[in-house]
Amino acid sequence: MSTVGELACSYAVMILEDEGIAITSDKIATLVKAAGVEIESYWPMLFAKMAEKRNVTDLIMNVGAGGGGGGAPVSAAAPAAAGGAAAAAPAKEEKKDEPAEESDGDLGFGLFD
């Protein structure tokens, strides 16, 4: 039941944030009740306190920026190690002009020379 309570309160917080409504425990509880989900009474209060201390929009936008991918290159992991507060702009790859590949014409490796 606790995972259902967490999920319902998470959705309620996202709805309130998206609508620009102040996030309070009463409003979270009202939304969850309107959805027909039964939760423990402490969940709305916990989520309301979390929303007071954190910017919910930043939390939503940085969901995928967290660590966890142990095989990622070091340069890509640096923004996540810095707290993930700002997403780093992807580095532009410079295209190097490579010489055109020469044909296999006369390299001395002919099979029937």
UniProtKB/Swiss-Prot annotation:
InterPro entries according to UniProt: P1/P2_N_sf, Ribosomal_P1/P2
Ranges where the record places region Disordered: 87-113
Gene3D superfamilies: 1.10.10.1410
The keyword Ribonucleoprotein is assigned to this record: yes
Family the entry assigns: Belongs to the eukaryotic ribosomal protein P1/P2 family.
PANTHER family the record matches: 60S ACIDIC RIBOSOMAL PROTEIN P1 (PTHR45696), LARGE RIBOSOMAL SUBUNIT PROTEIN P1W-RELATED (PTHR45696:SF42)
Known function: Plays an important role in the elongation step of protein synthesis.
Protein name, UniProt field: Large ribosomal subunit protein P1z
